[in-house]
């Protein structure tokens, strides 16, 4: 059913550059340069979309997405002077400039004769008096949240020049019960915490779920029947299979960028080394060969290199090697130990967990190890995962005490840290690519 809904959505969601919705070719004055570091959020007015409760819900989700990014400051609707009733009419720009709304979003949601929703919006530069963007979409009513996320992505991209990340999903480990008898299941949700549902229902420990590049399957580790194994799970059908029936423990799986291989750590003869498995031929290739623990591999976005953690030097550090295992080079040299590295989708940074001074931090560094920056520090922060635009990270935090872990997001400035709502405790998040 999920596959049918998505295919139907893909077929019927139509972006129209026409019918009066074409954006002005003039250069907009409203821009956000997110490469400058910590920027002042842009004041933006997002009106209630016209016609019905669902229309208002869509505009509310758009506002929430943009606000959570830290780059936009939606203006309180109580300050609006003009009450928009006709989205096709030119706004009264003076009314919006008075409240310092530098950008304005108006829209309309209507129901077609065949039951589909038609959602349309316009983005205006109020000080230049020009339309920056106009689009419309057709979809089924149950997909209204996706439409809201897609519109938020379009606004984000038009103003920042960067791809958005709102139309994405998070797979994670949902945790419940007391700390000494915690139950763990795989779960999936929208990036803002909505539409959460369980993917597994056993009492076996599950860890490190990771999306495939095509978003249709995940790989994860499970201790089913007390045997740690790496599995592939098809999201649409719920079918799963073991990735190789190895005699030792397998863990920390992750897909290659082309989705043709899984890279993982395999323990044999007391040592844990990095292996890849071709998902078609089921052949394995050993990439590291040490007496240490090599684990948590992550490919560069072009698939040419791999970052991983190893204690071959005495404590956990980060190393980079070629995708064939060649040129293994240590890149972390700061105080403390480093773990859970993951390469940015942009290729410019590697995120990691750092343990130092009794605390755990989430940070980033360049692939050569330079430019290390700590974004957040706490009692126990771990497991960073990148948004598909490479501008935001999600991780999990465990505070001292009897409580459980929670998910947080943080941007690369380190200033915009947000709690991600989940149903109960949550750990080990993994961010999907943009949906299609």
From Swiss-Prot:
Gene3D superfamilies from the UniProt entry: TolB, C-terminal domain, TolB, N-terminal domain
GO cellular component: periplasmic space
Keywords noted in UniProt: Cell cycle, Cell division, Periplasm, Signal
Position of the signal peptide: 1-28
UniProt-annotated location(s): Periplasm
Any Pfam family: TolB_N
SUPFAM superfamilies the UniProt entry points to: TolB, N-terminal domain, Tricorn protease N-terminal domain
Family statement: Belongs to the TolB family.
Oligomer status and interactors: The Tol-Pal system is composed of five core proteins: the inner membrane proteins TolA, TolQ and TolR, the periplasmic protein TolB and the outer membrane protein Pal. They form a network linking the inner and outer membranes and the peptidoglycan layer.
Record's protein name: Tol-Pal system protein TolB
Lineage: Bacteria, Pseudomonadati, Pseudomonadota, Alphaproteobacteria, Hyphomicrobiales
